[in-house]
C-alpha cells in the first residue's frame, strides 16, 4: 500500500461527499415537484409525454397499484428487448451482420438489463448489433435506474407521510427521474468521457495489420499445424453514450467484453476516477433526499455514515489483500518499487494499478453496478471475498440507484425494532410506530435474498452435469465462482468471477430466475411496508424515543447489517475464499 494509493481513495470519497448534498437537495425538489432550473425546458416535454401516454399525473397510487404499474412496465420493456435480440439480423445498424441471439441467452440478457443487473453471459462484440446495444440495452440502463429511483422515492414518501393511502404516481416518478436527473448528467458525462478517448461512432469494425505477425502451433488430428495472424479486428461502436448511463445508473454492462478495463470504455486514470464517482453519486445523494423529504436532514447523514463505515472497511481490506505478494511466487520480486506496483497485479491494468483496481472493485459491488476495471477472479482470496461480501450484504452500502437506499431503509426498520426491544417499548421511526406487520415485511425482504443465493448455489454444486462443469478451478475457488454468480444475479450486480462459463442452459435459466426474484419479488414486501407506514398516525417524539440522528444509531445500524447480513453467509464464505486463503498460505493450490 502506498501514500499515492490512499490519496486517490481520499480524493474519490471527498468528491462523492461534495456532490451528495447539492444533488440530494435537487432530487428532493424534483420529486416534490418544486421549481428547478430545468423546468422551463423539461416541463413542456413532461406534459407532452403524459398527453401521448394518457397518464394522469395528478392521480396518486396505492402501493398495490404502484407495484402493478412497475411490474407491467418492466414486463413490457423486457419483452421488447427480447424481441430485438431475437431478430437483430433483420434490423439496421448491424455492420458486422451478427445473427439473432439464441433464445435462452436472449431471455437471460433481457431479464438482466430489465432488473438493472446487466449480467453478461456473452461477448458483446460478437453477439450484439449496434441497434441492440442502443435500443435494447442502453434504454434499459435508463429505465431500470429510473425504476429504482422511483421505488426509493415511494419508500421515502411512505416514511414521511401520515394517514395517507398513496405513495405517489409511478409513471410521474419514473419520468422525472429520467428527464430531470439521469439525462442531464449523462449528456455532460458522455461528452467528458469522449474528451478522454472513449469512442462514439457507428463504424464497421476496423481490421488493422499488426507490426509483428503472431504464429501459433498446435496439434490437430495428430498433425502439427502452424497458423499466422497478421491482422487484428478492432471493435467500434457508440460507446460513450452507453458508458455514461452504465456507470451513473449503476448498471455495469460493458459495451465490450473487457468492460471498464477496455481502453475504449475507460482509457485514462481521470476517466476511471470519474466513472467511480458517478457510481456513488446518486446513491449518496439519495440519503440527503431522504433527510430533506422526511424533515430530518441529520437522519440522512446518519444513514450515510453507516454506508461510509462499511465502504471504508471493504476498500481497506481489499487494498491490503491485493498489495500482498502471492506466497507461491517465491522466485518473483513482488515488492513495490518506483518501477513496479508490487503485490498481486494479475488481472489488473497497469494504467490503474492496485489501489484503483481495489477501489473500483469495492465501489462497483457496494453499489449494484457490476462494471469492472480488473478481473475479480484473479484477486487474492481475501481480496476477492470483499466484492463478494459487499454483494451478500444486499448491496446497501450506497447500493444501486434507488435500490440501495430502500434496501438500507429495510435494515433501518430492523435496527429500530431491535433498539425498541432493548429498552422495552414499542419501537418508533420518524413518527411511525413499528409494529408486527412492518417487521414481518422487513424480514420477508431480508430472507428472500440469502434463500435464493444459497439455494441455487447448493443445487449447482450438487449437480455434476449442470453446475460443476462450468467452473474453471476445482476446490474452494470453484465454490466461490458459483457463489459469486448467484450472489451477483440475485443482488442485481452483474459482475462475475469470469472463470465460470455461464453461457449454458442451466446458468442462463437459473441465473435469469435469480435476477427476476432478486429484483421483483423483493420489491413487493418493500412497497407493502412503505404503504403500511404511510397510513400510520404521527407518534410524537418523547424522551423514550430512540434517536435516529446520532452516532449511536449509526453504530447500531452498522452492527445489525453485519450480524443479519454478513453472518448469514459466513459458513459458505468459510468453505470458499477463507479456506482458499488458508490453503494458499500453506502452499496449496488447485
Curated annotation (Swiss-Prot):
Record's keyword annotation contains Transmembrane: yes
Top-level taxon: Bacteria
GO molecular function: P-type potassium transmembrane transporter activity; potassium ion binding
Described function: Part of the high-affinity ATP-driven potassium transport (or Kdp) system, which catalyzes the hydrolysis of ATP coupled with the electrogenic transport of potassium into the cytoplasm. This subunit binds the periplasmic potassium ions and delivers the ions to the membrane domain of KdpB through an intramembrane tunnel.
PANTHER family: POTASSIUM-TRANSPORTING ATPASE A CHAIN (PTHR30607), POTASSIUM-TRANSPORTING ATPASE POTASSIUM-BINDING SUBUNIT (PTHR30607:SF2)
Subunit details: The system is composed of three essential subunits: KdpA, KdpB and KdpC.
HAMAP family for the chain: KdpA
Full protein name: Potassium-transporting ATPase potassium-binding subunit
Gene (UniProt): kdpA
Amino acid at each position: 500500500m502506498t501514500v499515492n494509493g490512499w490519496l486517490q481513495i481520499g480524493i474519490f470519497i471527498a468528491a462523492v461527499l461534495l456532490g451528495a448534498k447539492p444533488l440530494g437537495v435537487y432530487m428532493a425538489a424534483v420529486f416534490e415537484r418544486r421549481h428547478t432550473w430545468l423546468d422551463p425546458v423539461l416541463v413542456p416535454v413532461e406534459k407532452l409525454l403524459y398527453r401521448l401516454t394518457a397518464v394522469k399525473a395528478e392521480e396518486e397510487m396505492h402501493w398495490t397499484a404502484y407495484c402493478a404499474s412497475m411490474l407491467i412496465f418492466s414486463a413490457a420493456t423486457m419483452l421488447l428487448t427480447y424481441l430485438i435480440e431475437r431478430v437483430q439480423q433483420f434490423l439496421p445498424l448491424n455492420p458486422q451482420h451478427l445473427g439473432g441471439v439464441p433464445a435462452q441467452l436472449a431471455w437471460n440478457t433481457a431479464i438482466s438489463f430489465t432488473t438493472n443487473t446487466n449480467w453478461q453471459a456473452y461477448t458483446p462484440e460478437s453477439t450484439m448489433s449496434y441497434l441492440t446495444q442502443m435500443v435494447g440495452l442502453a434504454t434499459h440502463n435508463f429505465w431500470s435506474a429510473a425504476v429504482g429511483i422511483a421505488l426509493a422515492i415511494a419508500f421515502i414518501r411512505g416514511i414521511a407521510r401520515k394517514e395517507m393511502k398513496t405513495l405517489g404516481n409511478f409513471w410521474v416518478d419514473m419520468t422525472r427521474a429520467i428527464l430531470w436527473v439521469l439525462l442531464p448528467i449523462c449528456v455532460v458525462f458522455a461528452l467528458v468521457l469522449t474528451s478522454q478517448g472513449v469512442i462514439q461512432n457507428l463504424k464497421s469494425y476496423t481490421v488493422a495489420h499488426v507490426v509483428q505477425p503472431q504464429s501459433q502451433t498446435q496439434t490437430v488430428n495428430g498433425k502439427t499445424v502452424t497458423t499466422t495472424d497478421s491482422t487484428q479486428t478492432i471493435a467500434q461502436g457508440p460507446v460513450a453514450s452507453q458508458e455514461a448511463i452504465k456507470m451513473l445508473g449503476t448498471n455495469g454492462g460493458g459495451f465490450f467484453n473487457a468492460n471498464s478495463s477496455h481502453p475504449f470504455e475507460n482509457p485514462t486514470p481521470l476517466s476511471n476516477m470519474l466513472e467511480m464517482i458517478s457510481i456513488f453519486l446518486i446513491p449518496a445523494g439519495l440519503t440527503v433526499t431522504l433527510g430533506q423529504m422526511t424533515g430530518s436532514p441529520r437522519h440522512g447523514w446518519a444513514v450515510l455514515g453507516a454506508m461510509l463505515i462499511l465502504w471504508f472497511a471493504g476498500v481497506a481490506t481489499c487494498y491490503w489483500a491485493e498489495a500482498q505478494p502471492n506466497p507461491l511466487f517465491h522466485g518473483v520480486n513482488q515488492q513495490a518499487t518506483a518501477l513496479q506496483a508490487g503485490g498481486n497485479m494479475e488481472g489488473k491494468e497497469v494504467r490503474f494499478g492496485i489501489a484503483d483496481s481495489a477501489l473500483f472493485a469495492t465501489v462497483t459491488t457496494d453499489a449494484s453496478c457490476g462494471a469492472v476495471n480488473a478481473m475479480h477472479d484473479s484477486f487474492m482470496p481475501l481480496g476477492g471475498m470483499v466484492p463478494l461480501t459487499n454483494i451478500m450484504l444486499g448491496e446497501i452500502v450506497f447500493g444501486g440507484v434507488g435500490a440501495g437506499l430502500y434496501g438500507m431503509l429495510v435494515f433501518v426498520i430492523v435496527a429500530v425494532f431491535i433498539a425498541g426491544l432493548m429498552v422495552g417499548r414499542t419501537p418508533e421511526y420518524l413518527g411511525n410506530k413499528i409494529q408486527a406487520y412492518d417487521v414481518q415485511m422487513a424480514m420477508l425482504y431480508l430472507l428472500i435474498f440469502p434463500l435464493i443465493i444459497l439455494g441455487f448455489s447448493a443445487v449447482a454444486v450438487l449437480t455434476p452435469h449442470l453446475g460443476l462443469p462450468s467452473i474453471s478451478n476445482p476446490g474452494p475457488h470453484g465454490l466461490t465462482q458459483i457463489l459469486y454468480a448467484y450472489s451477483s444475479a440475485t443482488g442485481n450486480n452483474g459482475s462475475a468471477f469470469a472463470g465460470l462459463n455461464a453461457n449454458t442452459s442451466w446458468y442462463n435459466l437459473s441465473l435469469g430466475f435469480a435476477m427476476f426474484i432478486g429484483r421483483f419479488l423483493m420489491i413487493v414486501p418493500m412497497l407493502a411496508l412503505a404503504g403500511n407506514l404511510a397510513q400510520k398516525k404521527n407518534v410524537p417524539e418523547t424522551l423514550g424515543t430512540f434517536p435516529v440522528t446520532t452516532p449511536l444509531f449509526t453504530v447500531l445500524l452498522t452492527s445489525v447489517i453485519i450480524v443479519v447480513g454478513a453472518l448469514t453467509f459466513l459458513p459458505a464464505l468459510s468453505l470458499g475464499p477463507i479456506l482458499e486463503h488458508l490453503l494458499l498460505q500453506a502452499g496449496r493450490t488447485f
